[in-house]
């Protein structure tokens, strides 16, 4: 923290670690919070840009990322996260990769995630069962007019039927007529026979905006 204006918030749920951290890093510029990250994030409202650096418990890594990008009024400008290797690989999967999930597509709408490095399980004590990776989520910018809650709803629906074609997983699910589906698909340059994993960022943004502007759901 080279600038005196910077402040560091440390969140730890384990009582013993919390006490050790609080004692070790005692400073007016460091605030150590004894809390579950998923409980803290909704109440963590800051007006200035902030960054997140975390070694997350792997069982809550996705919920924490989702919360940071949907609940926070001010988005983090950058996140550096230690994740399970397979989770990190899924979050950077390109369009057309069957490894993509709805969170992959959601991240792509507002950021550029990339794997910085892999971390061997033998670098930890005790040795865990899984390998790890450091994921950098950079260039986080909320696209103009993007309704994040609507985006999550549409993406979750689309990827829930992962092997279904878009015309079934999205348009049929929301009871959109074939004629209207063709109109929307033409407008957003979407092939109705594509699957959710095939759609690119621009197509998702167009689809979400169309649904919002026309109050489809």
Where are these regions (language model features)?
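Catalytic cores of RNA-modifying enzymes
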Residues: 1-153, 157, 217
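Surface-exposed charge patches
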Residues: 23, 168, 183
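Residue-level marker of structural boundaries
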Residues: 26, 96-97, 175, 190, ...
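Generic macromolecular interface patches on structured domains
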Residues: 31, 165, 176, 214-217
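Alpha-helix boundary/capping detector
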Residues: 78, 94, 117, 180-181, ...
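An accessory alpha-helical subdomain
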Residues: 133, 137-139, 144-180, 188-191, ...
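SAM-dependent transferase fold signal centered on methyltransferase-like domains
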Residues: 184-187, 201-217
């Amino acid at each position: 923290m080279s600038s005196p204006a910077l402040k560091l918030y440390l969140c730890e749920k384990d009582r013993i670690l919390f006490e050790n951290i609080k004692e070790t890093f005692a400073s007016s510029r460091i605030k150590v919070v004894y809390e579950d990250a998923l409980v803290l994030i909704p109440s963590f409202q800051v007006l200035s840009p902030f960054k997140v650096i975390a070694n997350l418990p792997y069982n809550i890594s996705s919920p924490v990322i989702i919360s940071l990008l949907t609940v926070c009024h001010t988005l983090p400008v950058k996140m550096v996260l230690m994740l399970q290797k397979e989770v990190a690989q899924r979050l950077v999967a390109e369009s057309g990769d069957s490894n993509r999930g709805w969170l992959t597509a959601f991240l792509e709408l507002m950021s550029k995630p990339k794997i910085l490095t892999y971390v061997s399980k033998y670098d930890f004590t005790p040795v865990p069962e899984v390998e790890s990776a450091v994921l950098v989520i950079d260039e986080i910018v909320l696209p103009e007019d993007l309704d994040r809650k609507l985006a999550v709803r549409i993406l979750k629906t689309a990827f829930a039927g992962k092997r279904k074609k878009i015309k079934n997983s999205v348009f049929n699910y929301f009871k959109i007529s074939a004629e209207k589906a063709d109109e929307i698909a033409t407008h957003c340059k979407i092939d109705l026979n594509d699957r959710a994993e095939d759609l690119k960022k621009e197509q998702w943004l167009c689809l979400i905006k169309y649904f919002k502007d026309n109050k489809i759901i």
